[in-house]
C-alpha cells in the first residue's frame, strides 16, 4: 500500500510540474522520490513527521528565494531561441519557437503537435 501511495505522489508531482512549467518532470520526479525515500527513512529512525514537513517547507522557501534571485528575464528573440534550443536539445527547433513567439507576441498562444510526416 505504501508503494502505491508513493507512486501516485510521484505521478502527481510530474503531472503538476508539466501543467505549470511544461518542462522539468524528470527533475521533479527524482526530487520527489528522494524526498519520499529520505522522509520515510527519517520517520523510521524516529523523526517527527510534522517536523520533517516543516523543515521541507522551509527548504522549499529558501530554494525558491535563491532561484528567483538568480533568475534572468528572457526578453529578446535571441534569448528565447537560446533558451528554447536548450530545452529542445536542438538549435533549429529553438529558432522556430523564437520565430513563432515573435509573431504571436507575449499574450499569444503557440500549439505544438506531433506529426508522423517528416518536414510538415
Swiss-Prot record:
Its EC number is 5.6.1.7. Keywords: ATP-binding, Chaperone, Cytoplasm, Isomerase, Nucleotide-binding, Stress response. It is an enzyme of class 5 (isomerase). Its main location: cytoplasm. ATP binds at residues 23-27. InterPro entries: Cpn60/GroEL (IPR001844), Cpn60/GroEL/TCP-1 (IPR002423), GROEL-like_equatorial_sf (IPR027413), TCP-1-like_intermed_sf (IPR027410). GO terms for biological process: protein refolding. GO terms for cellular component: cytoplasm. It holds the Pfam family Cpn60_TCP1. GO terms for molecular function: ATP binding; ATP-dependent protein folding chaperone; isomerase activity. Gene3D superfamilies: GroEL-like equatorial domain (1.10.560.10), TCP-1-like chaperonin intermediate domain (3.30.260.10). It is found in: Cytoplasm. It catalyses: ATP + H2O + a folded polypeptide = ADP + phosphate + an unfolded polypeptide. Forms a cylinder of 14 subunits composed of two heptameric rings stacked back-to-back. Interacts with the co-chaperonin GroES. Belongs to the chaperonin (HSP60) family. PANTHER family: 60 KDA HEAT SHOCK PROTEIN, MITOCHONDRIAL. Together with its co-chaperonin GroES, plays an essential role in assisting protein folding. The GroEL-GroES system forms a nano-cage that allows encapsulation of the non-native substrate proteins and provides a physical environment optimized to promote and accelerate protein folding. This is Chaperonin GroEL. It comes from Mycobacterium shimoidei. The gene is groEL.
Amino acid at each position: 500500500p505504501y508503494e502505491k501511495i508513493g507512486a501516485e505522489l510521484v505521478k502527481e508531482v510530474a503531472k503538476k510540474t508539466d501543467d505549470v512549467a511544461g518542462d522539468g518532470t524528470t527533475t521533479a520526479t527524482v526530487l520527489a522520490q528522494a524526498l519520499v525515500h529520505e522522509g520515510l527513512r527519517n520517520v523510521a529512525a524516529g523523526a517527527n513527521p510534522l517536523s520533517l514537513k516543516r523543515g521541507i517547507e522551509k527548504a522549499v522557501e529558501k530554494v525558491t528565494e535563491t532561484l528567483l534571485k538568480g533568475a534572468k528575464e528572457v526578453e529578446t528573440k535571441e534569448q528565447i531561441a537560446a533558451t528554447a534550443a536548450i530545452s529542445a536539445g536542438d538549435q533549429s527547433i529553438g529558432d522556430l519557437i523564437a520565430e513563432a513567439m515573435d509573431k504571436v507576441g507575449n499574450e499569444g498562444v503557440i500549439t505544438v503537435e506531433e506529426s508522423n510526416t517528416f518536414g510538415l
